[in-house]
Amino acid sequence: MIIDSHTHIGKFLNFDLEGEVLLEGLKKYGISFALVSNLEGGEVDHQQKEIPILEQHSQIETNKRLLKIVRKNQDKLGALIWIRPRNEECNTELEKLIEENLDIIYGIKVHPYHSKFPFNDKKMFAYFKLAEKYNLPVVTHTAVDKDSHPRLVYEVAKLFPNVNFVMCHMGLATDNEEAIKLIAKLPNLYGDTTWVPLDKVKKAIKICGKEKILFGTDAPINGMDIYKNEYYKDYFNKKTNLSKEVLENLLYKNALKLFNIKID
């Protein structure tokens, strides 16, 4: 079994990620289940210039589209609710949407870079309290920029010990070293493999523990064959040299436990 804990759908800037492409890739590469968020919730572009407000999609609109696709494919997909803290609030409408779809919602997705909004800003705390209320992990993009830096996630994780946080990328565009050290310090901090070299994944497992790292890819950012690229191919070619127990934890058991996924 394989669970991809980091996938996307949506039309956003130069990305056009259809749900069918994601599903075809899962089938082709034997992925049993994937957690997915909708990129259309992005608030700024790749240069962090604000997207014209009339071209943006609201939190509710973004997540209703996601939930429609997930609902039709709930044996294969689970929803990560994308939030928009720059332009919107954690409001009762969002909470109602979550309450009504808890059977297919597995977490809350944060992208500090594409919101141009610091992960540790106090406005974010309402979202984290919502995550705590519904026992939903918070999955966040982490990178070298000031809004997404792993240190901010660590700071917040200390303030919210009852919420589990996943550092996607373990610090994109870094050597991953600081993120790995931070993940090891707290029981409610996790990392994923998205764009992380295998040697750093192994180091993270060694330092943080075999229960702390999740398999994720950003599929289908580069098409359905993203699983063949240099970062992920060894997981499918069985060339990781990880023990059976460690590999099973990485590929699916950690995700099953953290997100409370129930699949056959």
What is the predicted function of each stretch?
Residues T7-H8, V21-P52, L77-R84, Y106-G107, ...:
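Divalent metal-dependent hydrolysis catalytic cores, especially in the metallo-beta-lactamase
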Residues I3-T7, A34-V36, L77-I81, Y106-V110, ...:
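Hydrophobic faces of well-ordered beta-strands that scaffold small-molecule active sites
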Residues E18-G30, T92-E100, V201-I207:
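Short amphipathic alpha-helices and their capping/turn segments at secondary-structure boundaries
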Residues K49-P137, L189:
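Active-site gating/metal-coordination segments in enzymes
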Residues N120-L214:
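Catalytic pocket-lining loop regions of alpha/beta-barrel enzymes
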Residues M1-S5, D16-S37, K210, G223-D264:
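Mid-to-C-terminal alpha-helical segments outside catalytic/metal-binding sites
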Residues H6, L26, L66, I108, ...:
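Conserved, mostly hydrophobic/aromatic
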Residues G10-F12, G41-V44, P85-E89, S115, ...:
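Active-site environment of divalent metal-dependent phosphoester hydrolases
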